[in-house]
Amino acid sequence: MTQEILKNADIIHFLKNTYPGTGFIDSLKIKYRPLISPFTDLIQKVKPAEKVADIGCGSGQFLLLLSKFASPSSLSGFEINPRLIDNANNLFSTIPTGIDYNFSLFDGVNFPETLKEMDRVFLIDVFHHVPKAMQETFLKNLCSSLKPGAELVFKDINAASPLVYFNKLHDIIFAGEIGNEWPMEKVINILQQQGLKIIEQYKRRIYAYPHYTIVAKK
C-alpha cells in the first residue's frame, strides 16, 4: 500500500487486527483515535530510512502504524508510564515489523541521549498534558536535545479555538485530567527562539477537535 492512498479505514482495520486486549479505555483510544486525529498526514511526513522517535508514545500505536505504512530505519518510543511501555514492548515482540525498535522510560523533563540520534521526532497530543509550570522548560529541553538537521513534528490542540473545550471534555473522560493547551502561535515563537526553522504549519479541524501541526527543523 502506498502512502498516497492511505485512508483512516486502512489504519483502523490494521489496528483492530493487530492490537491485543489492553483494557477497555486503552482499546478505545488505540483503535479509534485515527477518526479524530490526523494520523494519515503525520504518517506521510516520514521519509524512507529515517530514524524516528515518538515522545509520549503510549502503547506504541503510532510507531506501529509507521512500521506498517512508512519506511523508517528504526523506531524509538519514550514514555513516562511503565505500564504503557510494557504494552508497547509486548505488542512489538509479537508482531514482526522487520524494523529495529526500542521503548524507554523517561522522567518527562530530561530527554534521553538517544534522542540526539533521531532524524524525525514526533510529539503528538502530548504537550497539553505536560504540567503547566513545566511546559516551557519541556519544550526548550526538547529543542536542545535535537541534533542539527533533525525535524520536530509537533501536533496538538489549538487553545485559540473555542472548540478547545471539546478536547478538555475528551481528556476528562479518557485521561482523567484537564490539559493546558497552547495556541499554535505561542509554540512557534518558542521554537523559533530556540533556533528552529518553521518549515510547515497548518490548522485542521476534525469533527470538534481543532488540531494544529508544526514541522520545525533544528
PLM segments and residue spans:
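Conserved alpha-helix/loop element of class I SAM-dependent methyltransferases that forms part
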Residues: 32-48
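Conserved class I S-adenosyl-L-methionine
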Residues: 50-58
